[in-house]
């Protein structure tokens, strides 16, 4: 099985909240695709609650599109990481970390503006596979934490995992 790029970075050196360009690709037709690691929590020290990350998934995807999509950028997907320390965002385009960070902070402000559970998009049995597994309160706490701590940048060259540690 090939070793995925996400496992070639040293998680003990990651800062959070922080943006990292995880991967860039050029499609056969010449489109740039960028995958971002949006790290909310310090790996192995903090974790997002299941209900909080699920609610954030419903809110964050739309808010990030509101703040980041434009003529040269289109978000393909924003998905929570299995380790529950952040999200991966794949998009067409090449925004820099600062632009992504600004959109992320604005999105966290938007999350705080959601006043009640009924305002969470797609929160119903038809559009959500675990529609009872949500917490707006937890999502608000996550957003407050990101805003209070600020968003830094993780660089791949600073996180390169020593080959002796690759398994």
Curated annotation (Swiss-Prot):
Its cofactor is Fe cation. Binds 1 Fe cation per subunit. One of its GO terms (biological process) is L-methionine salvage from S-adenosylmethionine. Its EC number is 4.4.1.21. Pfam families: LuxS. It comes from the Bacteria. It is an enzyme of class 4 (lyase). Keywords: Autoinducer synthesis, Iron, Lyase, Metal-binding, Quorum sensing. InterPro entries: LuxS_sf, Metalloenz_LuxS/M16, S-ribosylhomocysteinase. Homodimer. HAMAP family: LuxS (MF_00091). Belongs to the LuxS family. Involved in the synthesis of autoinducer 2 (AI-2) which is secreted by bacteria and is used to communicate both the cell density and the metabolic potential of the environment. The regulation of gene expression in response to changes in cell density is called quorum sensing. Catalyzes the transformation of S-ribosylhomocysteine (RHC) to homocysteine (HC) and 4,5-dihydroxy-2,3-pentadione (DPD). This is S-ribosylhomocysteine lyase. It comes from Haemophilus influenzae (strain ATCC 51907 / DSM 11121 / KW20 / Rd).
